């Protein structure tokens, strides 16, 4: 079992450009973490909505995308290819993320990123679909398999401004529909 951090603020990641992303710098801001893939059927929708949320809360929300290739091999780009894939292929049209993308990682199994070990421990299933599981066992390419595993691309985790994991959302929950929860956490009038 992966090491589980004691606090959200003890975690970190490495951005696509190789810089350390220290979660301790996120104190006082809500954080939205989403496992992403550039070749998924919902890539355009979800990446566009991630940009929208980051633009709506530029100083009070941190959006982090974690590319992962564990679901249908839909993020088969190398780290240095991901931004060009997003810009020219899907979503395409010159798309550029307004949020931070970190280096490709695993979100399930023995080599899961410590961020996901922590988040799945605190939020073991999506609130909108508590029975969400990988539907086709032939697609499971990691071990060990756990009930709390991320089921597919674009699962989302929302963390409050005090570093407390607030809610996990399934892949079918539209990213933009998280906005009321972000406002609630930031105490913004809805």
Curated annotation (Swiss-Prot):
GO terms for biological process: response to oxidative stress. It is found in: Cytoplasm, Cytosol. GO terms for molecular function: electron transfer activity; glutathione peroxidase activity; phospholipid-hydroperoxide glutathione peroxidase activity. It is an enzyme of class 1 (oxidoreductase). InterPro entries: Glutathione_peroxidase, GPX_AS, GPX_CS, Thioredoxin-like_sf. Pfam families: GSHPx. It comes from the Eukaryota. GO terms for cellular component: cytoplasm; cytosol; intercellular bridge; mitotic spindle. Its main location: cytoplasm. The active site is at 40. Its EC number is 1.11.1.9, 1.11.1.12. Homotetramer. Belongs to the glutathione peroxidase family. Catalyzes the reduction of hydroperoxides in a glutathione-dependent manner thus regulating cellular redox homeostasis. Can reduce small soluble hydroperoxides such as H2O2, cumene hydroperoxide and tert-butyl hydroperoxide, as well as several fatty acid-derived hydroperoxides. Cannot reduce phosphatidycholine hydroperoxide. This is Glutathione peroxidase 2. It comes from Homo sapiens (Human).
């Amino acid at each position: 079992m992966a090491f589980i951090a004691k606090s959200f603020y003890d975690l970190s990641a490495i951005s696509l450009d190789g810089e350390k992303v220290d979660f301790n710098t996120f104190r006082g801001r809500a954080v939205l973490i989403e496992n992403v893939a550039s070749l998924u059927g919902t890539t355009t929708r979800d990446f566009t909505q991630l940009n929208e949320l980051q633009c709506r809360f530029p100083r009070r929300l941190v959006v982090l995308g974690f590319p992962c290739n564990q679901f249908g091999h839909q993020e088969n780009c190398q780290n240095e290819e991901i931004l060009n894939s997003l810009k020219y292929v899907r979503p395409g049209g010159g798309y550029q993320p307004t949020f931070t993308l970190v280096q490709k990682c695993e979100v399930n199994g023995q080599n899961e990123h410590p961020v996901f070990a922590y988040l799945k421990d605190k939020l073991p299933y999506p609130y909108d679909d508590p029975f969400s599981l990988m539907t086709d066992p032939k697609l499971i390419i990691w071990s060990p398999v756990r009930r709390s595993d991320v089921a597919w691309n674009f699962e989302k985790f929302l963390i409050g401004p005090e570093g407390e994991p607030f809610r996990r959302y399934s892949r079918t929950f539209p990213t933009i529909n998280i906005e009321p929860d972000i406002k609630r956490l930031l105490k913004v009038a809805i």
